[in-house]
């Protein structure tokens, strides 16, 4: 017989993929409004709208990987994903974990960069030896909240650290439970993707759209000279 906690899990996860359910046990970093770590919180706890609507906030990161031609790598989230399944989004968007001395390290955004390398490998199969922590440039942070329309008991409420990397020779072997498709796009092709979304032809994650429409173009146009555009780590854009 299922315990009470198991019964609750069955109700919340009904119809969802077992691998994705298991990942909901990961310990994210619960933060305050200024992105200061408070405590660990499971991926499940931090993504339930009942908690989000009570103010629960966690740390995240978004990777924007460009190739040598200046094209941006996008992924389409697998249908197995619990939040925003089938949506197009930036290269990788995920969460650093509550790991002291590693993904919790604040200096130079070291912790989120360690997490970013881990998730490039997990989601897109990028070999660990093809990515160095120093390949990532931290740009800024955004604070946003969004409900997952497909299953509105789930959502996001994050302070999202934006990381940019430009590199050729990246091997991609996408994990099908995470990623159903991927492609490199030009600025014009990304503009078309948003037009297609407006016409109901595709779905795009809300955080990617926010970042792309409010911040991305100056970075994209200055990939060879990002340093002047890097913002202080205490800068948080609220949406």
From Swiss-Prot:
Single GO BP term: isopentenyl diphosphate biosynthetic process
Pathway connected to this protein: Isoprenoid biosynthesis; dimethylallyl diphosphate biosynthesis; dimethylallyl diphosphate from isopentenyl diphosphate: step 1/1
Binding site for Mg(2+): 47, 58, 156, 158
Active-site residues, record numbering mapped to chain: 93, 158
Positions with a binding annotation for substrate: 43, 77, 81, 94
Domain of life (superkingdom): Eukaryota
Cofactor note: Binds 1 Mg(2+) ion per subunit.
Enzyme Commission numbers on file: 5.3.3.2
Cofactor (UniProt): Mg(2+)
Record key words, sorted: Isomerase, Isoprene biosynthesis, Lipid biosynthesis, Lipid metabolism, Magnesium, Metal-binding, Steroid biosynthesis, Steroid metabolism, Sterol biosynthesis, Sterol metabolism
GO cellular component labels: cytoplasm
Domain Nudix hydrolase as annotated: residue spans: 56-210
GO MF entries: isopentenyl-diphosphate delta-isomerase activity; metal ion binding
UniProt keyword DNA repair, yes or no: no
EC primary class: isomerase
Family, as annotated: Belongs to the IPP isomerase type 1 family.
Protein name: Isopentenyl-diphosphate Delta-isomerase
Species the sequence originates in: Dictyostelium discoideum (Social amoeba)
Gene it is expressed from: ipi
């Amino acid at each position: 017989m299922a315990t009470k906690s198991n019964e609750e899990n069955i109700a919340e996860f009904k119809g969802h993929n077992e691998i994705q359910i298991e990942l909901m046990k990961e310990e994210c970093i619960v933060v305050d409004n200024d992105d200061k770590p408070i405590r660990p919180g499971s991926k499940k706890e931090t993504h339930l709208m009942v908690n989000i609507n009570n103010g629960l906030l966690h740390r995240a990161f978004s990777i924007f990987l460009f190739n040598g031609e200046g094209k941006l790598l996008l992924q389409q989230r697998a249908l197995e994903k619990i939040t925003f399944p089938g949506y197009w989004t930036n290269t990788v968007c995920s969460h650093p974990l509550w790991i002291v001395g590693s993904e919790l390290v604040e200096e130079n955004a070291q912790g989120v960069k360690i997490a970013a390398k881990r998730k490039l490998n997990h989601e897109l199969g990028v070999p660990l030896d093809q990515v160095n922590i120093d390949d990532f440039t931290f740009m800024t942070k955004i604070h946003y909240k969004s409900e997952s329309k497909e299953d509105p008991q789930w959502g996001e409420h994050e302070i999202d650290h934006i990381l940019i990397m430009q590199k050729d020779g990246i091997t991609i072997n996408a994990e099908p439970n995470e990623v159903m498709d991927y492609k490199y796009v030009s600025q014009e092709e990304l503009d078309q993707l948003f037009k297609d979304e407006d016409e109901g032809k595709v779905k795009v994650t809300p955080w990617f759209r926010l970042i792309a429409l409010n911040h991305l173009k100056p970075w994209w146009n200055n990939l060879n000279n990002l340093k002047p555009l890097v913002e202080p780590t205490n800068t948080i854009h609220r949406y």
